[in-house]
């Protein structure tokens, strides 16, 4: 399955490194509003096509799955457009800010028999391996409660009076908003 990447920020770079390890899922296109950042990412990760118009990338028959790594406020419209174009969608978290938007995307995906996934990696987190290891010692597990948190330098900016997008409701904030 061929991947078209949407966005060229830090998380997109992290994922591009991971996608490069997949032999059966090459990244064949990248979309960026800026031709310069799109070309830079394409050169860094050997991505053959760069688009500065999202609809043009969606019209590319070679793109089968769209990976969305843009500000959260863009996720709904970009995911919806991809589904309407017949593409599978892998979207960074939070996928959308409201249940109504999620329901709409899920309905579209189901109607078109497409996959809609949120990119969350906690299933591969080392803590799950520890839980499995300790299960042998403590016996059958009935319930597990986990808390996952990570310090963000953007919190420092927020505490200094700035409003990074992750704390800005206009951008649908971060995963906690």
Tell me what each language-model feature is.
Residues 2, 25-29, 64-66, 116, ...:
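Short active-site oxyanion
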Residues 45-106:
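Beta-loop-alpha module in the N-terminal Rossmann-like domain of NAD(P)-dependent dehydrogenases
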Residues 104-121, 140-144:
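Rossmann-fold dehydrogenase core element
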Residues 122-177:
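Predominantly a Rossmann-like dinucleotide-binding segment in NAD(P)-dependent oxidoreductases
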Residues 14, 40, 56, 65, ...:
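Alpha-helical elements of Rossmann-like donor-binding domains used by nucleotide-donor carbohydrate transfer enzymes
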Residues 1-45:
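N-terminal Rossmann-like dinucleotide-binding module
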């Amino acid at each position: 399955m061929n991947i078209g990447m949407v966005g060229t920020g830090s998380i997109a770079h992290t994922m591009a490194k991971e996608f490069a390890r997949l032999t059966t899922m090459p990244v064949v296109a990248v979309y960026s509003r800026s031709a310069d950042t799109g070309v830079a990412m394409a050169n860094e990760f050997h991505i053959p096509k760069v688009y500065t118009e999202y609809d043009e990338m969606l019209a590319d028959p070679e793109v089968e799955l769209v990976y969305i790594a843009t500000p959260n406020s863009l996720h709904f419209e970009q995911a919806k457009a991809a589904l309407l174009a017949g593409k599978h969608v892998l979207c960074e978290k939070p996928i959308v800010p409201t249940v109504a938007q999620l329901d709409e995307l899920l309905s579209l995906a189901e109607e078109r028999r497409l996959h809609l996934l949120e990119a969350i990696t906690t299933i591969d987190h080392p803590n799950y391996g520890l839980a499995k290891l300790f299960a042998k010692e403590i016996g059958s597990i009935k319930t597990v409660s986990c808390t996952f948190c990570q310090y963000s330098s953007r919190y420092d900016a927020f505490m200094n009076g700035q409003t990074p997008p992750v704390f800005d409701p206009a951008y649908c904030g971060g995963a906690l908003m």
